[in-house]
UniProtKB/Swiss-Prot annotation:
Protein known as: Zinc finger CCHC-type and RNA-binding motif-containing protein 1
Key words, A-Z: Coiled coil, Metal-binding, mRNA processing, mRNA splicing, Nucleus, RNA-binding, Spliceosome, Zinc, Zinc-finger
GO cellular component: U12-type spliceosomal complex
Source lineage: Eukaryota, Metazoa, Chordata, Craniata, Vertebrata
Quaternary context: Component of the U11/U12 snRNPs that are part of the U12-type spliceosome.
PROSITE patterns per the UniProt record, alphabetical: RRM, ZF_CCHC
Length: 218
């Protein structure tokens, strides 16, 4: 199973289809019954021409049942169409697996260049709008990739310390070391320490004239 799909219950087997109908034609025909996930036309191995048989995978079993009720034994381009719920042969997972067509320069239907299968001239019912769902998925993947890149950048920035903060811590440590050095110096030389302390204290000097008051000088 993939994406919650149940191909054994939501796949319609359609036969007696006009050989000229393309994959895109069938998409347009069956889309009236519900969301079509995939259309597979059985083709001759040698001629690559349609055998008039197709498997149509719907998004849900209700749409598949609506298709069977609405299309079985009905006339389509002058042919009586047979439609029934397909029997699971054990290859359901393989059937719904997404195929990637790397060569976008050629049409999947006719093999010519200059157009894609959605606009192939062999489409009896005209051009079909390319599915928008795939484009949304691509956009979503791009957004997710951008978010992952941002997360990676944020994580890389968290590794190690900020150089500015590192310089500040070094400056503080250097200043603290100088203070400690001065304190140790005063301990070893009390006279110098007292001299230094005296230099910070206000000095008392006597006035040039005799007085009982002392004069303070800076």
């Amino acid at each position: 199973m993939s994406g919650g799909l149940a191909p054994s219950k939501s796949t319609v087997y359609v036969s007696n289809l006009p050989f000229s109908l393309t994959n895109n034609d069938l998409h347009r025909i069956f889309s009236k019954y519900g969301k079509v996930v995939k259309v597979t036309i059985l083709k001759d191995k040698d001629s690559r021409k349609s055998k008039g048989v197709s498997f149509v995978l719907f998004l849900d079993k209700e749409s598949a049942q609506n298709c069977v009720r609405g299309l079985n034994n009905k006339q389509l381009f002058g042919r009586a169409i047979k439609a029934s719920i397909a029997k699971d042969n054990g290859r359901a997972t393989e059937f719904i697996r997404r195929r990637n067509y790397t060569d976008k320069s050629r049409c999947y239907e006719c093999g010519d260049t200059g157009h894609l299968s959605y606009a192939c001239p062999k489409n009896m019912l005209g051009e079909r709008e390319p599915p928008q769902k795939k484009e949304k998925k691509k956009r979503k993947r791009l957004v997710e990739e951008e978010e992952e890149e941002v997360v990676e950048e944020e994580e890389s920035e968290d590794e190690g310390e900020d150089p500015a903060l590192d310089s500040l811590s070094q400056a503080i440590a250097f200043q603290q070391a100088r203070i400690d050095e001065e304190k140790n110096k005063y301990r070893h030389d009390p006279a110098e320490a007292s001299t230094s302390e005296d230099s910070r204290r206000p000095r008392i000097k006597k006035s040039t004239y005799f007085s009982d008051e002392d004069e303070l000088s800076d």
